[in-house]
Amino acid sequence: MVLFEVRASVVLYNILRSLVKYGHIKKDSIFLLPLNICPIVPAIFLKAGVKFDFIDISLKTLCIDEGVLLEKINKNKNIKGVLFVKSYGTNYDASNLFIEIKKIDDNIFIIDDSCLKKPDFDYDIEQSQADLIIFSTGYSKYVDIGWGGFGFLKDSYKYDKQHMLFSNSDLMQLTKQMNSSILHGKSFYYVDNNWLGSDTHLYNSFTEYAKYIKNILPKVTKHKELINDIYKKELNYKVQMKEEFSNWRFLIFVNNKEHMLKKIFKAGLFASSHYKDIGAMYGCNYKDKYTNAKYSHSGIINLF
């Protein structure tokens, strides 16, 4: 089943509400999320009324720690969902992990979050170990048209589109509150309103949308490869991260990250940091623990 919305976050919200409506997710059910996830994602779960918990990442894959994940699933029968984020657009194959999850509990709903990966319109979800895969062409994604998200859902599940009002001022206020929580290391208190959605509508037809993205994809890929080749040649190999993490942006790891970013900005150039460990933001009781998510954030810079 093809899912197509104004934002990938709307796809996620709609599937969560559908899982609740059709009894796959119950009152005590829990989804597991990685600690280095985009901070707006847990807010989608709060809006949908679905409980969640965080798991630290692996420094090897920069994705959710598989050993800890499986241990937690074995111990807690209320875990009924896993959101596996392909951090930095990595092509890491998590199929074996998904198989192990299904061995423990075949009813656990697995989402393959590929929003930072190259959009794939030919993905065969019925041959996948995941139940849903999501891609995005929104702001700062692999292909950025500032709009649109799509996914593929196994036909054994139902998907209902929710009628939602959208207020840009609500979204701006939510973003402001989140940024403040991240900056000051304080808890984020969620207040539900009309922040989810978009007041822009570029395509009604998924076919036309897919045609446009497919058409510009080779140019985007070629440009990224050109930039990455320059970085590979010019930068010290010791700061370069593995090539598998440079599909979306070119990643480096440095000890003086903040100083480096200031120098880049001062030169009129642009780079970015990535998502922090958001455990403290959402009230996790291990907020003072030096997690792998905190460590990776302390040194990783995304080069454009």
Where are these regions (language model features)?
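Active-site phosphate-binding strand-loop segment of PLP-dependent enzymes
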Residues: 61-147, 151-158
